[in-house]
A protein has these predicted regions:
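Long, non-coiled-coil amphipathic alpha-helical linker/lever segments
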Residues: 1-17, 79-95, 175-179
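Long, hydrophobic, amphipathic alpha-helical segments used as structural scaffolds
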Residues: 1-7, 11, 37, 41-44, ...
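Charge-rich, acidic-biased intrinsically disordered regions
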Residues: 3-25, 49-64, 126-141, 178-184, ...
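Internal glycine-rich alpha/beta core junctions
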Residues: 18-169
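Glycine-rich cofactor/substrate-binding loops
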Residues: 124-125, 138-248
Length: 248
């Protein structure tokens, strides 16, 4: 919040562009993260209770007077799960695949955040503060490498690789059932472990950074060309022809 209104150059295609604020750039990611978290939270996992091939065969053979679909739905819902009215031997895991896909999307936003912070550090727009006893670089004492953001990016990439493997596998099972998804699902814990490691790295890295206010404002003051968008808009408003070329 302290630096949320700090004006700074924006960069499109790596070149100075119409200005932004530090707070605006962070709020972009806050907005995106919330968007994907809301989608993830909205997805309820499903359950089924309709027998070995999903047809209530044994249920009806044992007791024909019971409405097994209604009873099964009541039982599944009592476990906090949404009821799957259609399945094979297994619950078809489309909801799980949808949740994994949204988790993949969220991870991409976090990777984008880690890379943007990395770039701002490389421009010296953000400074990293070392704690006592920390080493910034193994051989170059003048450096403070952005290892927390690099670690987060790497671990999120591994998590995304596992998500793709899981998502692609769990939606496919031969006829009424095969076990090829079983060994894949054993990796779901590893997947979320990589995400947790990444989140901890991001939290650690964010705690170290602060803006280099002097350099940010100096670069902004030396980049008057970024006003051309605003100037040409005013010229167009006032009917000046070919304003883009004239400003260029």
């Amino acid at each position: 919040k302290k630096y949320s209104k700090l004006s700074m150059l924006a960069f499109t295609h790596g070149q100075p562009a119409s200005p932004t604020t530090l707070g605006k750039e962070f709020s972009n990611f806050s907005y995106r993260i919330k968007f994907h978290l809301d989608h993830i939270k909205s997805i309820k996992q499903k359950g089924k209770f309709n027998g070995a091939s999903g047809n209530y065969n044994a249920h009806l053979f044992a007791e024909k007077k019971v409405n097994w679909e209604t009873l099964s739905k009541k039982f599944v819902n009592s476990l906090g799960l949404d009821f799957s009215s259609h399945s094979t031997q297994i619950e078809l895991k489309d909801a799980m695949a949808f949740q994994l896909a949204n988790t993949h999307n969220l991870n991409n936003v976090l990777i984008d955040f880690a890379q943007d912070i990395w770039l701002l550090i490389s421009k010296n727009y953000l400074k990293q503060n070392l704690k006592a006893g920390e080493v910034g670089s193994s051989t170059m004492p003048h450096k403070v490498n952005p290892i927390d953001f690099e670690n987060a990016e790497g671990n999120l990439s591994i998590a995304n690789g596992l998500i793709i493997a899981l998502k692609n596998k769990i939606q496919i099972s031969r006829l009424q059932r095969d076990l090829s998804d079983s060994t894949v699902l054993r990796n779901i814990g590893s997947l979320f472990a990589y995400i947790i490691i990444s989140l901890n790295s991001l939290k650690k890295g964010i705690a170290k950074i602060e803006p280099n206010k002097e350099l940010i404002l100096k670069d902004l003051d030396n980049s008057w060309e970024i006003l051309t968008e605003a100037i040409q808009t005013i010229l167009r408003k006032n009917g000046v022809e070919d304003s883009y070329t004239k400003i260029k």
